[in-house]
Amino acid sequence: MSAAKLNVKTSAKPNSRIAVEVEVPANRCKNSYDEALSKLSRSISIPGFRKGKVPKTVVIQQLGVKRIQASALESLLQKVWTETLDQEGIEPLCEPELEDGFETILENFNPEKTLILKLETDITPIPTLKKSSGLTAEVENLIFDPKKVDELIEQSRAQLATKVPVSDRAAQKGDIALVSFKGSFSDDGSEIEGGSADSIEIELEQGRMIPGFIEGVIGMNINDEKTLKCEFPKDYHQEEAKGRKAEFNVSLEDLKIKELPELNDEFAKQASDKENMSDLRADLEKRLKEDNDRKQAKTRQDSLLDVLVKELEVDLPKSLIDQEVRTIVEQTAQNFAQQGIDVKSMFTPELVKSLMESSKGEAEKKLRQKFALQALAKSEKIEVSDKEINSKLEQVEADIKLSNEKNIDAERLKEAITDDLLQEKLFAWLEENNTVVEKTPEKARDQIKEKSSKKKTTKTNKEKKSSKTPKS
């Protein structure tokens, strides 16, 4: 026999929160108390009594009424809350909060009387859009810079460079120095954690080490020893080192320079699968242009999403923001771990607290973007069909087989594909029903003016030359 319907009152609160008042009949309170007493009498061990055969009066005497009432109330709260959610169709985002607190309710709890419970919880917000079409988004036009081809080639040259020993001069900027060092803090002489190394290669370029270190090594000769005075940046990742002055005892053991390969067809074969420099340049230019186009498309999407979010009306609950903040911090930790950084020592409680505080803005922005797209999909009835999902799934599964990937979660893969396809449709709708104004960046405008000015100057000079009267 199912329990009688509960008398429930609900009222909306700010930030997608709901207040729930439940009237629990006295008979249910009494039943819960009796059940708790019976359960405890079966589980408690008391000298002189067999387990499970302890009289209830002895249990009450041993444990006290409040202990039994606490057990009864805890069980009652759980059951009543589950029934309330089911009865009222409430989908909570977090555990409920008791308005008066458990201890206060327990203090006033009488199993013979009706219990009034007042709880609050967060619920999923219902987003709406004031407007979704006829909007205007401004986006900076990303102009492809041919110089990037040369930059990539120079990076490849640096990677394929030969290290040549140097012994007849002091260390210079750009050299590769083999050094050993030991660091300590200037204020108390304590050793710096991770501040010592034996025979490691360091490229003498600014930004490779903390300020003062590279500058100090430059000018040293092989076998020289020197004490460098440095200072850790105020935003340094290790909390105990932030802004502190330090001293490093450094010895220069060896010195090398990078000898770059010549830019010829042999280099093209080494750096790529191309046979000559002409093909290599053409391939790099093609890839860079494609990358530029992808970035431009992403910039357009971001701009359209920004103007759509401005039309969004949504009340974000605290629990959702907190959850998104945790996700951002966890992703940050994973990124550092992938770079080989010791996350456990780096992520101190102070740093985690600081990161969580500073990530709130980003978390709210991401949630607003998510709800704006959800509201658009609902209002415009934009959906992805099973046929579209299965077609894309077949393509992806074929690629997975070719790459010999294993341990793929089929359900998560399908969810990701569905989300991607829906997002494609949503942005296609936004592009079609709104205006994107592309603006030329100021730097690019200056370059265009400069080129135009040079062309005019060249043309004027030619005209001057042609207008001169020839000598007779």
Swiss-Prot record:
Biological process terms in GO annotation: 'de novo' cotranslational protein folding; cell division; chaperone-mediated protein folding; protein transport; protein unfolding
- Where located? Cytoplasm
Its UniProt entry gives the catalysed reaction(s) as: [protein]-peptidylproline (omega=180) = [protein]-peptidylproline (omega=0)
User: Coiled coil: which residue ranges?
Assistant: none
Spans annotated as Disordered: 438-472
Tell me which residues make up the PPIase FKBP-type domain: 174-261
What is any one of the record's Gene Ontology cellular component terms?
Answer: cytoplasm
* InterPro entries, per database record: PPIase_dom_sf, PPIase_FKBP_dom, Trig_fac, Trigger_fac_C, Trigger_fac_C_sf, Trigger_fac_ribosome-bd_bac, Trigger_fac_ribosome-bd_sf, Trigger_fact/SurA_dom_sf
E.C. designation(s):
5.2.1.8
Function of the molecule: Involved in protein export. Acts as a chaperone by maintaining the newly synthesized protein in an open conformation. Functions as a peptidyl-prolyl cis-trans isomerase.
What is written about domains in the entry's comments? Consists of 3 domains; the N-terminus binds the ribosome, the middle domain has PPIase activity, while the C-terminus has intrinsic chaperone activity on its own.
State the protein's name: Trigger factor
Organism of this sequence: Prochlorococcus marinus (strain NATL2A)
Q: What is the lineage of its organism?
A: Bacteria, Bacillati, Cyanobacteriota, Cyanophyceae, Synechococcales
The encoding gene = tig
